């Protein structure tokens, strides 16, 4: 059954805009779980622009579903993950000047480094997912790292300027799923998904989890986190 991981980063973004203590992303995670979230996703960036180390430590103690820690493949972040032991880690690219993650990891271009990071984390019983574009070479390289999962970057699909291009990007995601599954990888997806565009991605064969944040937090500002999550679960089933 397809599951929903709710990314709570942008609750912390609102908090950090005023460098205050509210809203609390930990409280948001509790409400997201009450609304039906199957997991909580949080990205601890190197620049700490939203989530803070303390948030991640408290989430590790309070999340009742599973905690997916998004992070760069750096020594600092690997050490934090080995200490906190999230339920799994998603390795993502980072650039300090970006507004949000702009594309997938270049696994093929950093294969030995990423093999080492994946091995260290999975040897500590922390499954690893690699955030990548739906590209044949990147999917093949991901399998070579021995990571358990990939997360397909859905940004090109979500940002498509018209229906024809959107359908082409959806087909690329479908082919990516098929290739990954044939190589023994498990498949998640996320980035830019909304209540309006999520259903076709949710229907892709073999998809396990969608990680969705900004649109849910945006909706939660108006209707509350529990309802926003419930509505996304409906949208994923084509019932909204």
From Swiss-Prot:
User: What is the documented function of this protein?
Assistant: Catalyzes the complicated ring closure reaction between the two acyclic compounds 1-deoxy-D-xylulose-5-phosphate (DXP) and 3-amino-2-oxopropyl phosphate (1-amino-acetone-3-phosphate or AAP) to form pyridoxine 5'-phosphate (PNP) and inorganic phosphate.
E.C. designation(s): 2.6.99.2
Record's InterPro entries? Aldolase_TIM (IPR013785), PyrdxlP_synth_PdxJ (IPR004569), Pyridoxine-5'_phos_synth (IPR036130)
| Name of protein | Pyridoxine 5'-phosphate synthase
Which organism does this record belong to? Answer: Crocosphaera subtropica (strain ATCC 51142 / BH68) (Cyanothece sp. (strain ATCC 51142))
Which branch of life, at top level?
A: Bacteria
The record's subunit annotation is:
Homooctamer; tetramer of dimers.
- Site positions for Transition state stabilizer: 151
């Amino acid at each position: 059954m397809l599951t929903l991981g709710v990314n709570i980063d942008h609750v912390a973004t609102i908090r950090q805009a005023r460098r205050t203590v509210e809203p609390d992303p930990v409280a948001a995670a509790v409400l997201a779980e009450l609304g039906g979230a199957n997991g909580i996703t949080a990205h601890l960036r190197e620049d700490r622009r939203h989530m803070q180390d303390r948030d991640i430590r408290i989430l590790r103690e309070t999340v009742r579903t599973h905690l997916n820690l998004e992070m760069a493949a750096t020594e600092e972040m690997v050490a934090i993950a080995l200490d906190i032991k999230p339920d799994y880690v998603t390795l993502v690219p980072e650039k300090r000047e970006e507004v949000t993650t702009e594309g997938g990891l270049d696994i093929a271009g950093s294969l030995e480094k990423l093999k080492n990071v994946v091995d260290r984390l999975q040897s500590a019983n922390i499954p690893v997912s690699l955030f990548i574009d739906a590209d044949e070479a990147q999917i093949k390289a991901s399998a070579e790292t021995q990571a358990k999962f990939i997360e397909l970057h859905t940004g090109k699909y979500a940002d498509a300027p018209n229906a024809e291009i959107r359908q082409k990007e959806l087909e690329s995601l479908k082919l990516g799923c098929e290739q990954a599954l044939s190589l023994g990888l498990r498949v998640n997806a996320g980035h830019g998904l909304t209540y309006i565009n999520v259903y076709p991605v949710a229907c892709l064969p073999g998809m396990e989890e969608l990680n969705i944040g900004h649109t849910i937090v945006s909706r939660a500002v108006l209707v509350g986190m529990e309802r926003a999550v419930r509505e996304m679960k409906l949208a994923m089933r084509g019932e909204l």
